[in-house]
Amino acid sequence: MGSVTGAVLKTLLLLSTQNWNRVEAGNSYDCDDPLVSALPQASFSSSSELSSSHGPGFARLNRRDGAGGWSPLVSNKYQWLQIDLGERMEVTAVATQGGYGSSNWVTSYLLMFSDSGWNWKQYRQEDSIWGFSGNANADSVVYYRLQPSIKARFLRFIPLEWNPKGRIGMRIEVFGCAYRSEVVDLDGKSSLLYRFDQKSLSPIKDIISLKFKTMQSDGILLHREGPNGDHITLQLRRARLFLLINSGEAKLPSTSTLVNLTLGSLLDDQHWHSVLIQRLGKQVNFTVDEHRHHFHARGEFNLMNLDYEISFGGIPAPGKSVSFPHRNFHGCLENLYYNGVDIIDLAKQQKPQIIAMGNVSFSCSQPQSMPVTFLSSRSYLALPDFSGEEEVSATFQFRTWNKAGLLLFSELQLISGGILLFLSDGKLKSNLYQPGKLPSDITAGVELNDGQWHSVSLSAKKNHLSVAVDGQMASAAPLLGPEQIYSGGTYYFGGCPDKSFGSKCKSPLGGFQGCMRLISISGKVVDLISVQQGSLGNFSDLQIDSCGISDRCLPNYCEHGGECSQSWSTFHCNCTNTGYRGATCHNSIYEQSCEAYKHRGNTSGFYYIDSDGSGPLEPFLLYCNMTETAWTIIQHNGSDLTRVRNTNPENPYAGFFEYVASMEQLQATINRAEHCEQEFTYYCKKSRLVNKQDGTPLSWWVGRTNETQTYWGGSSPDLQKCTCGLEGNCIDSQYYCNCDADRNEWTNDTGLLAYKEHLPVTKIVITDTGRLHSEAAYKLGPLLCQGDRSFWNSASFDTEASYLHFPTFHGELSADVSFFFKTTASSGVFLENLGIADFIRIELRSPTVVTFSFDVGNGPFEISVQSPTHFNDNQWHHVRVERNMKEASLQVDQLTPKTQPAPADGHVLLQLNSQLFVGGTATRQRGFLGCIRSLQLNGMTLDLEERAQVTPEVQPGCRGHCSSYGKLCRNGGKCRERPIGFFCDCTFSAYTGPFCSNEISAYFGSGSSVIYNFQENYLLSKNSSSHAASFHGDMKLSREMIKFSFRTTRTPSLLLFVSSFYKEYLSVIIAKNGSLQIRYKLNKYQEPDVVNFDFKNMADGQLHHIMINREEGVVFIEIDDNRRRQVHLSSGTEFSAVKSLVLGRILEHSDVDQDTALAGAQGFTGCLSAVQLSHVAPLKAALHPSHPDPVTVTGHVTESSCMAQPGTDATSRERTHSFADHSGTIDDREPLANAIKSDSAVIGGLIAVVIFILLCITAIAVRIYQQKRLYKRSEAKRSENVDSAEAVLKSELNIQNAVNENQKEYFF
């Protein structure tokens, strides 16, 4: 019910916001009157005019008066045409023409607006586009609707480009309507206090709207408080708006009672900014200009105890709850409404509800501060000083985002040298230099590139130099030498002119980009209007009477928590520690599933998973168990066995499960998986799951759908049964669950919950443990998921005219597309989506070129990646494209990515409206022939297979994965196709695992052996295709490949022995002196050929690798990858009737040479690994039998790892992956080696033996102990009390169930 109420409130908020926006913007159908045509001639002005007949008064649209339009005297970017609308109006559209019947027209222009005729502001589209496209001829009309509209009195058109064969020429019209404005001017000491009737106040709803403008960066706009510390405050701080809400005791702040929201930036620009605050219950909208923040307040927000008064512009009395520093607002407020009440109108009428404190006026004063914008690093302002005083002094204010740049340079008169004032790393530095003398430096301020206004004062007099920043005097420095300093030189602000002008100006760190104002030289304020008109000083690339700074980090286009920083012309994203990369932190560095990690060749371990790729969900850590199928294992906090007593329907027990991921992350992971399951075990003693009399559930569980579920493990939602009920083997056939038999003894119902739409389990409720001797216990396993529906989702396109279509792709500001393809065609379009003018297209342009082309309004761009090899090789290739605010990029496979920077201040919105075509185009031409797989757009997978099933000439699925992924199968493993994906067949490999990369090793104790009998194998497999059948006695073996590794310290030792029925043999031994010997006897009438490697002691306890490759009489031998030898046999070229292969001790050793016999009698003690003779792997056959292999094992042979160092347990280096406990350090990309070492296993084993010997317990007790030991190892962090309780319960369960066949043994 709460969620429904929240949704309703949110909808009402949205509707009220839309209504407010309509009021703010005006009704577009009623606000489109022409505003220029009826204006008097005096309303038009310009920078200059070519002649009296080209004056600004002739610039009316469609008029032919005079010369047919306005043209300036000189065509350059400093010209402008200005319109005075007489009063503030709402302007909703503009239209332009060129000069009538001429070659004079403007092709692009800026539109600026102002209330006072100075301090102009540029109008921007899409929050970044400053320029309007103009005309292509003299007479056609180009019309633009302004969204949002402009509220201003003055408009100024500034031509940027014009017809290169003519000059600037303009005729214009603007459209709009009258604008209602009620204003109040507050001087920084005054405020308004509104007291309202309690009856008129809604307890759950508040709407406050206003506009403000100011030159101050700090001030209180509104404040309302209560007696207990509750308050709502809207405060301007550092030119940003903060909404502060405290809904609890101010002395005890907490995250549930404090709200601190920030919106807006650079709000002290003396231009109007709109604010809207809407509260409906706990739903709050906070809007500043076009930026909106919606949030759901926590705590008792809708029950705030506030007084029945609200102040605007300040806090009139000492606040009972305000502990933060604050000052009153200095500026103007407009159209101030509180819950529909016009506050300014009430104040004008001097109504008793309004108390005006201080000097309050109802007209807005216009401070005549004229800023100047330095647009580029080439900008400068050169001003003369004619005062001739014995002092060099200047003051000014500046604001910028750049860390470095020249602020001021002045030459010294009568003596050579100069004074430099510049920014370096955000600090202000002053430098006075004279030739032949060391410079005198002063450093002041920090982080002065924060976009705020900063004041600077410079003074150099006699032998003293001082600098002040924001009123703080920096350390003064004595000047070098007794020379007197005189003013009268030229002051260069912001940069230096070209050297061709003969200037001595120096700019060590480049020019300044930013704004300056209030410039004074020798105590006299500089008249910038005179500068603009050319009568004072000189300048280049300036915008006078306007500050064009903008905050490129608002809104923050850095995604996924990336930190935004900026300079004058661009922004940068720091993606450190976000888990994402790219220009805007859009691309996840993690895979989306364990399946994807597996097909990169990764082994079992911990990995970060990003289920929705570049989508909003954060990555999270889980465990991937890489078996033949990749299993995703997600843990929760309820893995302990939990006992429950003393519950009933009136007093139920509820257990909650919290997972390592959020519910949204879990849902994305589950939806992506092919299959998910959770094992649930319910132990019971007189505790039922269902009341048989009325069918009422006595226990139930809840999943992610928040619905009650009464089916149990092994069953499905439509059958309220347990596993035994489905299998028909419950302990009481009258019931469908063991626990429903209600017996006074422990039993259980265990099974898998596998209906993934209901998973994971989030809650368990138990109500039937309140009777005598009644008790229950439960244990929930981790969430296990396998497969990836998206990774293999694919479609095959049969003709060039075939395609799949999907809804329009929405990636206005940030878009990424990724997919796999394979083809034999030389070209074809993978994907295309069109708009009215915008589009994106990805295609195979030629066999070696993939191209990404797009247009977002700045003209078409293309990015191509060329490969040295062909893409149409029928192998899978991966394509990823991205387009964002900063750049577009294309990467194919592992080739170097290609990028295309976005144009500065260009169009940014990708606006598409057609269907998305996959595998073809709307024209049904240049379609793609081949397969496309795993197509994702902004992290969301398109279901190609589902759409292909209903589309002609397109087939669901693709085959031929082994051509691309076969290389993942190692050590002789063979890639086999599956309907979805592939697998590695390790049948004829000495290795195992999903990629045949896990070596099979064994520790051989003294006197032990493994014997593989080929003749018996032939009898078993002569009708099969087994490669072992090739060793039949009737066959002659002219070649073999032998590989293995070993570690030992014993001599002599027999490593490997192969014999035949004709007394031929091959032996690999370590002689008494530690040398390795390989003996071939391929003719029973000759002595064996002996190859001796005596370069080192091979029984040194280190791991050694042996490879023997025989081709008839030539044998190639390699030892440890660095010792190689080739020998020619004299005893024969064929191995006839192979009998057996022996590892370790030879039980029958007649007819062999003495050294082999001695080594064979001794056998082998140590570790052997990955033993393979051609396609026979004897250790694998012995330790991992898949069918009745003819293998005999004698003595102590145990699976181990040869990677262990001497003196340690042979298994201590093995990776152990337990579902219940995965601990250790975490690497972002590679698996985590488990910290559970086998030392504990060895100790546990010894303890088990001691207990067995001392107590002589039964086999059942041994199993109980093993369960307890394994459980203890997997749950090492559990408290002793929990361990004890579980051990007792397990003992009860196992002793009782030793005679109960229905008891399921469950442990990891």
Curated annotation (Swiss-Prot):
User: Which UniProt keywords are given for this protein, alphabetically ordered?
Assistant: Cell adhesion, Cell membrane, Cell projection, Disulfide bond, EGF-like domain, Glycoprotein, Membrane, Repeat, Signal, Synapse, Transmembrane, Transmembrane helix
Record domain Laminin G-like: where: 212-364, 398-547, 793-957, 1046-1202
The family database entries (InterPro entries) matched by this protein are listed as: ConA-like_dom_sf, EGF-like_dom, FA58C, Fibrinogen-like_C, Fibrinogen_a/b/g_C_dom, Galactose-bd-like_sf, Laminin_G, Neurexin-related_CASP
Has keyword Glycoprotein?
Answer: yes
Question: What are the TM regions of this chain, as residue ranges?
Answer: 1242-1262
Which residues does the entry place in the Cytoplasmic compartment? 1263-1308
Cleavable signal peptide: 1-25
Query: Subcellular localization, per the record?
Result: Presynaptic cell membrane
The main location is membrane
Task: List the ranges whose topology is Extracellular.
Answer: 26-1241
Q: Which residues form the EGF-like domain?
A: 549-586, 958-997
Q: How does it sit in the membrane?
A: Single-pass type I membrane protein
User: Which domain of life does the protein's organism represent?
Assistant: Eukaryota
* Residues bearing carbohydrate: N260, N285, N359, N538, N574, N602, N625, N637, N706, N748, N1023, N1073
Residues covered by the Fibrinogen C-terminal domain: 587-792
**Which SUPFAM superfamilies does UniProt cross-reference here?**
Concanavalin A-like lectins/glucanases, EGF/Laminin, Fibrinogen C-terminal domain-like, Galactose-binding domain-like
Task: Tell me which Gene Ontology terms the entry assigns under biological process.
Answer: cell adhesion; regulation of grooming behavior; regulation of synaptic transmission, dopaminergic; regulation of synaptic transmission, GABAergic
Start and end residues of each F5/8 type C domain: 31-177
Q: Does the UniProt entry include the keyword Repeat?
A: yes
Annotated disulfide bonds: C31-C177, C332-C364, C515-C547, C553-C564, C558-C573, C575-C585, C931-C958, C962-C975, C969-C984, C986-C996, C1167-C1202
Spell out the NCBIfam families in the cross-references: GGGWT_bact
Describe its assembly: Interacts with TIAM1.
- What is the protein's known function? Presynaptic protein involved in both dopaminergic synaptic transmission and GABAergic system, thereby participating in the structural maturation of inhibitory interneuron synapses. Involved in the dopaminergic synaptic transmission by attenuating dopamine release through a presynaptic mechanism. Also participates in the GABAergic system.
Q: PANTHER family in the record, alphabetically?
A: CONTACTIN-ASSOCIATED PROTEIN-LIKE 4, PIKACHURIN-LIKE PROTEIN
Member of which family? Answer: Belongs to the neurexin family.
Please identify the protein, giving its name as recorded: Contactin-associated protein-like 4
Q: What is the lineage of its organism?
A: Eukaryota, Metazoa, Chordata, Craniata, Vertebrata
Q: Gene for this protein?
A: CNTNAP4
